[in-house]
Amino acid sequence: MNEVNEKLLGDIKNNIDRTWNDDAADKKLSGIILRGCNRINDICGCEFDYEQENTAKELLISYVMYALAGALDDWQKNYSQDINRLQLIQEVKAYADREAGKQGIV
């Protein structure tokens, strides 16, 4: 992910109760969102669609809140169960895809 779209930015702003428009704050928030997306993608080994309401988006929202509070060191520790769950789900999906490919199933 290279750029935050307006929908995702709006969703995150709504979730963190930032209802006002401020270009400088939006730019900073967009950077935090991008870093969060990249970190979650790296941890799980795949790219998620953060516009969908899913566990990855929940983790992203929590990442943003922790980043804004200056507490990113605590984020991975406090959300380790959710992160591990998301990793396992992705590993199971990847395994199923590999097995389906071996059997010629699409």
What are these regions (language model features)?
Residues D49-E53, L59-L72:
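Mid-chain, well-packed structural core segment of small domains
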